[in-house]
C-alpha cells in the first residue's frame, strides 16, 4: 500500500443520525421512500476528522442489518475496540474488528471513516490511496417505479437530455416488460438496464426472457439475494447478462458467483461488502474473471456519494454507476461542496480524503440524535 509509514490515532467519535426529505417519491419492489434516515460516523484524530455514512435501513429489507442494530454495535463493540488506539493504516482498523462476524455495513462505517481520516492526515485524495487514477467517472441514474409507461418515458427523457450515460429502471412482477418496451421504443440507442431487487423467482424465467428483445446491458439482482444456484440457472436460460448486487457481500462471494456463472457483472456497493479494502478485493476478483463492476447507490447524502465516487476511480469500474447529481435527491445536501454531474460525468472531488466538507450548520437542523464517544 502506498503512503505507509504515517500512523494515525483515533481519539474520539461522534454518531449523528439525520433525516433528509427526498425531492421525489422513490418506489422499488421493496416499497416507497419519501425521506432518508442518514446515520453518520465521525472519527477524530490529531485535529482531523474522517466521516462515513451508514447505508442500512430502519428495517432489514436490503440486507440483514438495521440502523438500530448497527448503532448498538458501534456503541458497544466497534468503537470501544478502536478509540484511543493508533493504527498504521485503515486496514489495521478493520483488523481490530476482525474477530466479529458479519455486520458489514456497520463495519464499513468504521473502516470508511478511518480511510477518510487517514487520507486527510496524509493530505492525499482518497481515490489516490485506493489506487484510482480517474479525474471524473461515468454516471447513470436509477429511476423508481412510475405511475405508467408515459410517465416513465417522460422521466427517462429528462435524464437523457441531462447527459446521463445509463438509465436504470426499477421493475417488479407486473411492471417489467411494459416500461422497458416503452422506453426502448422511445430511445433506441441509450444504455438501458433494469433492477428487480430480488422480486422474481426462477419460475419467472419466461417473463424475464421477454426482456431479451430490448438490448439491456444487464438485469440486476432478479432472484433471491442468497441464491447463486438459481441465478446461474437463469443465466443459462436468457441472453441478457445478469448483474449481482445483494448476492455479493465479499470477495469470496464474488469468486463463487462468477465461477458458477451466476452473473457477469457486479454492482459494487462499498458498505455492503464492509468497506474500501474489501471493495478493492471484490474489484480485483471481478477483474480476474473479466467481469466489469460499477458503483451502486443507496440514496446516499454527499458523504456516502463522495466515498462512492473515489472508489469508482479504480480501473475495473467500466460501467456507469449510480452516483448521479446530489441535487436530484436533496434540496440541500449534508456537505458544502456540490456533487454535480456534467454530460454524464461526475468530477472526482479534489483535496485530502473524500474532498468534501460536512455542513455542520445544516446538519444541526436535520439531526434527530447525536452522541459522542471517547476512549
Swiss-Prot record:
Cofactor(s) of this protein: a divalent metal cation
Effect in UniProt of substituting residue 72 to C: No change in activity
Keywords: Isomerase, Lyase, Magnesium, Metal-binding
Record's cofactor remark: Binds 1 divalent metal cation per subunit.
Gene3D superfamilies per the UniProt record, alphabetical: Enolase-like C-terminal domain (3.20.20.120), Enolase-like, N-terminal domain (3.30.390.10)
Keyword rRNA-binding among record annotations: no
Effect on the protein of changing residue 149 to C: Retains 88% of wild-type activity
Catalytic activity, as annotated: N-acetyl-D-methionine = N-acetyl-L-methionine; N-acetyl-D-phenylalanine = N-acetyl-L-phenylalanine; N-acetyl-L-glutamine = N-acetyl-D-glutamine; N-acetyl-L-tryptophan = N-acetyl-D-tryptophan
Binding site for N-acetyl-L-glutamine: 142, 168-170, 269, 299
pH dependence: Optimum pH is 8.0.
Protein's UniProt name: N-succinylamino acid racemase
